[in-house]
């Protein structure tokens, strides 16, 4: 296969979500090829220099390089559109055919709350390049768990939660929807206006789940996923509830949580629907710059999302409705 960057025009999916308060853009994309040689990507990213690395997660074995290209011609351009180029190796674990399957999956998804997939570039027996839009504010993880002076205001946190919920509601609305097994804070990207965009690559395989457990990344593991290996839309809802919880608490310091007690168990045993309890749990960096009523309502929503009984968890559209209501609470 020769050097090429391929991108796609858009058409509406067969099933669209219910109307949202923040209007989404729905479309699935049919592929029309346009070439960009690999040397163009190298030029755009300064030959994949280390100082161009913008995102690197050891859990998902991928690395992104920042570059700039002309939005129309896809040629390297200093004044062009920011891109994030991911270099994927074709080896015994993932072949060229595997990555092409990923490309086909990405080509069917387009939404304002999904990171825009611009195309791919590959050669036989060479690395496989996936090209995405560049997220100028980085990942949500870097803001919530970063430096104290970078703490996000309450209104921005709610806005990010709504955007993330919109992306998930869109995915859940599609027939035979792919479930977002990579839904984590570090895969929620933010643009310059703090609009949330889900980075979706492919459903997480069981081997990745096992590897995550070995590395201690069990914070988001739902009861049915961990014990029975059951994965469905309610699993996504549970994971989203965990993200809401970390948005609310804002700290990875688990010293106050007993080692044998999970984050959800700590939450459910500590949370009561009153303002005083919320003040003990909420991110202290917020000070008093938040609505205690809104935070309490978010706590109630978290409880619903993380219910052990999957039948008691709300649909993502219901979660979105709840968040839109929370956004309107000012007292």
Curated annotation (Swiss-Prot):
Principal cellular location given in the protein's record: membrane
Expressed in which tissues: Restricted to stigma in flowers.
Reported consequences of knocking out the gene: No visible phenotype. Slight hydration defects of wild-type pollen placed on the stigma of plants lacking both BKN1 and BKN2, but normal pollen grain adhesion and pollen tube growth.
Residues with lipidation of kind N-myristoyl glycine: 2
Residue positions bearing lipid (S-palmitoyl cysteine): 4
GO biological process, one term: pollen-stigma interaction
GO CC aspect terms: nucleus; plasma membrane
GO molecular function, one term: ATP binding
InterPro entries on file: Kinase-like_dom_sf, Plant_Ser_Thr_Prot_Kinase, Prot_kinase_dom, Ser-Thr/Tyr_kinase_cat_dom
Superkingdom to which the source organism belongs: Eukaryota
This protein's domain notes: The protein kinase domain is predicted to be catalytically inactive.
Function: Collaboratively with BKN2/SZE2, involved in compatible pollen-stigma interactions.
Name under which the protein is recorded: Inactive serine/threonine-protein kinase BKN1
């Amino acid at each position: 296969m020769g050097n090429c960057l391929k991108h796609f025009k858009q058409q509406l999916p067969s099933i669209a979500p219910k109307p949202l308060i923040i209007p989404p853009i729905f479309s699935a994309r049919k592929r029309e090829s346009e070439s960009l040689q690999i040397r163009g990507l190298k030029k755009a990213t300064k030959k994949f220099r280390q100082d161009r690395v913008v995102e690197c997660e050891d859990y998902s074995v991928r690395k992104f390089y920042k570059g700039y290209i002309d939005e129309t011609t896809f040629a390297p351009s200093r004044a062009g559109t920011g891109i994030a180029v991911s270099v994927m190796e074709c080896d015994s674990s993932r072949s060229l055919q595997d990555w092409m399957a990923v490309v086909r999956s990405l080509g069917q998804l387009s939404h304002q709350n999904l990171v825009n997939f611009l195309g791919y570039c590959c050669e036989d027996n060479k690395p496989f390049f996936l090209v995405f839009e560049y997220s100028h504010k980085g990942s949500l993880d870097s803001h919530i768990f970063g430096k104290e002076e970078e703490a996000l205001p309450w209104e921005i946190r709610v806005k990010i939660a709504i955007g993330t919920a919109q992306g998930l509601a869109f995915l859940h609305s599609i027939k035979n929807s792919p479930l977002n097994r990579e839904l984590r804070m570090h895969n929620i990207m933010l643009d310059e206006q703090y609009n949330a965009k889900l980075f979706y690559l492919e459903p997480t395989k069981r081997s990745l789940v096992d590897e995550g457990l070995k590395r201690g990344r069990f914070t988001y593991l739902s009861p049915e996923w961990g014990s029975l290996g059951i994965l469905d839309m309610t699993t996504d809802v549970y994971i989203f509830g965990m993200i809401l919880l970390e948005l609310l608490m804002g700290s990875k310091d688990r010293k106050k949580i007993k080692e044998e007690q999970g984050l959800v168990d700590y939450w459910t045993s500590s949370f009561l629907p009153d303002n005083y309890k919320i003040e003990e749990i909420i991110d202290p960096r917020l000070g008093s710059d938040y609505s205690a009523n809104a935070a309490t309502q978010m706590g109630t929503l978290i409880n619903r999302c993380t219910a052990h009984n999957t039948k008691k968890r709300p649909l993502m559209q219901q979660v979105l409705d709840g968040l839109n209501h929370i956004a309107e609470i000012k007292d």
